[in-house]
Amino acid sequence: MAAESSYGFVYGVSGPVVTAEKMAGSAMYELVRVGHQELVGEIIRLEGDYATIQVYEETSGVTIGDPVLRTGKPLSVELGPGIMGSIFDGIQRPLKDIADITQSIYIPKGVSTNALSREARWDFVVSKDLRVGGHVTGGDIIGTVDENLLIKHKILLPPSACGTITFVAPSGQYTVEDTLLELEFAGRKQKFSMLQIWPVRSPRPVTEKLAANNPLLCGQRVLDALFPCVQGGTTAIPGAFGCGKTVISQSLSKYSNSDAIIYVGCGERGNEMSEVLRDFPELTMEVEGVTTSIMKRTALVANTSNMPVAAREASIYTGITLAEYFRDMGLNVAMMADSTSRWAEALREISGRLGEMPADSGYPAYLAARLASFYERAGRVKCLGSPEREGSVTIVGAVSPPGGDFADPVTSATLGIVQVFWGLDKKLAQRKHFPSINWLISYSEYMRALEEFYEKNYPEFVSLRTKCKEILQEEEDLSEIVQLVGKASLAESDKVTLEVAKIIKDDFLQQNGYTKYDRFCPFYKTVGMLKNMIGFYDLARHAVEATAQSDNKITWNVIKDSMGDLIYQLSAMKFKDPVADGEAKIRKDYEDLAEAMANAFRNLED
């Protein structure tokens, strides 16, 4: 039995917020166990010897006078092999293991299981340069575990550790708790295993933050071409219901060029999480000639809308801590938070129960600060320890403003923090134009950072993108005139702009995520398609403007009649399947089309 002083008593209960007395000596954000069922809670306010606790489980049945056990440690997560491919709830309880233990589809109250299996044995390969008498510091890699084909799990020393090695375990099979290394520092000996415990609210330390300069390619043409994000960037996807936020964040986790994915379903529908669980194991990728499931590089933190509200806040922190752990191994991690609005609503509810002063729309005044402290944990960094390595965490946060109103406090606070804004448009979604990203309001502030990458790999791309945006903007301006006076009264060059903009919108920006050929578009295909479309525009404009004064004028109708086949081929560029056809064939086909267009226009002008 624990000492008497480590117990307090329940004084009042209001939904997920419990007040306890006789809690003198406890700390902010300390983990406590409430009631006879030992529900998990966290102290969020201290006054005298009263503590206010937010409980991460259903509080029905807790009565006045129930014991509150103090644990003396903050809310923490377990880090080690076995994270990938598993499903946790908001406070890192493994849902699969709980289902196996209880044989029930419900999570019982007060259940406590280890996040990582203590029985599973992992093949540990010790680092070559570790030997007794050597010195190590925090963040050093002490060995590797091949967790699966996709993730080579590097075992790191905790950031605070350092000292002289007194014992090294040989390579072999170990559980996560077996001692692998013993250090001595200032006369104290410490043992280290594969398992690390880390408090979720404090960011993991790094050597330095670096400028991000490598694009996060997500296989959606409109995003990769017009509004690119970088590895280590922050992105917001705001949009009303049914605009396709979840589809975009799922396709990001399926096809992006990240090494590991943490997908946090925070207060969204349970069906969306089960969709992820159903789709991901079926999706495969090729690694060294072996086909393996994409689930092997994904960890899910599932916290659906019918789970307790307080755990939503924890789930975001749990997710970002897992992401930082994989970043410290030198991986590029992408974290999807779907959706941060539900998290803000949880903050609002707790804040209301505490009787704090409400600010805009009833959200607490510290909403923007909380959002910033979460988003600022993204970035590309130089990791602690040796050997030197770089890692990154990219955060993609979906925001669902009520009624699709972007002036909502959560959306406006988020836009002040993130660098990339992919605004979804209800009108586009109603026209069945997916991904429904509004190319007039979205923006990316990483254009300058990525210029070097484009110059090196796709030198013509930057000018193509600028031209593409100009065409879309011109089309928007012309559309008002067309609505007033009709198409016929426009100048010929404006007709060309309208028609090419239509091709760009329907065949470049639009993308069917449920087809083999279009669910993922590699960057070379994106650039090739854009090059031909802009090439056609330049040739057509030139032909129209060069012959405007002569007798045999070339009008848009002449071009359309004589080049129907080429225009069809422009639209059909998207049907090339990157997996079946391969890069070389697609590139050659696009070059042949460009040549055919140039010849056709030459013949037309002659």
From Swiss-Prot:
A Pfam match: ATP-synt_ab_N
GO molecular function: ATP binding; ATP hydrolysis activity; proton-transporting ATPase activity, rotational mechanism
Principal EC category: translocase
Native source organism of the sequence: Caenorhabditis elegans
CC annotations in GO: proton-transporting V-type ATPase, V1 domain
Record protein name field: V-type proton ATPase catalytic subunit A
HAMAP family the record matches: ATP_synth_A_arch
Effect of disrupting the coding gene: RNAi-mediated knockdown causes larval lethality. Results in increased protein aggregation in the oocytes of sperm-deficient young adult females which is not eliminated by mating. Impaired yolk uptake by the oocytes from the pseudoceolomic cavities. Causes an increase in the section of the excretory canal, which often has multiple lumens and abnormal whorls. Does not affect alae formation in larvae.
Subunit description: V-ATPase is a heteromultimeric enzyme made up of two complexes: the ATP-hydrolytic V1 complex and the proton translocation V0 complex. The V1 complex consists of three catalytic AB heterodimers that form a heterohexamer, three peripheral stalks each consisting of EG heterodimers, one central rotor including subunits D and F, and the regulatory subunits C and H. The proton translocation complex V0 consists of the proton transport subunit a, a ring of proteolipid subunits c9c'', rotary subunit d, subunits e and f, and the accessory subunits vah-19/Ac45 and vah-20/PRR.
Catalysed reactions listed for this entry: ATP + H2O + 4 H(+)(in) = ADP + phosphate + 5 H(+)(out)
Modified residues (N-acetylalanine): A2
UniProt signal peptide: none
UniProt xrefs under CDD domains: ATP-synt_V_A-type_alpha_C (cd18111), ATP-synt_V_A-type_alpha_N (cd18119), V_A-ATPase_A (cd01134)
Gene Ontology BP annotations: ATP metabolic process; lysosomal lumen acidification; proton transmembrane transport
Notes on activation and inhibition: ATP hydrolysis occurs at the interface between the nucleotide-binding domains of subunits A and B. ATP hydrolysis triggers a conformational change in the subunits D and F, which induces a shift of subunit d. The c-ring is subsequently rotated and results in a continuous proton translocation across the membrane.
Binding-site residues, ATP: A240, F241, G242, C243, G244, K245, T246, V247
Free-text function comment from the UniProt entry: Catalytic subunit of the V1 complex of vacuolar(H+)-ATPase (V-ATPase), a multisubunit enzyme composed of a peripheral complex (V1) that hydrolyzes ATP and a membrane integral complex (V0) that translocates protons. V-ATPase is responsible for acidifying and maintaining the pH of intracellular compartments and in some cell types, is targeted to the plasma membrane, where it is responsible for acidifying the extracellular environment. Required along with other vacuolar ATPase components for the removal of protein aggregates which form in immature oocytes in the distal gonad.
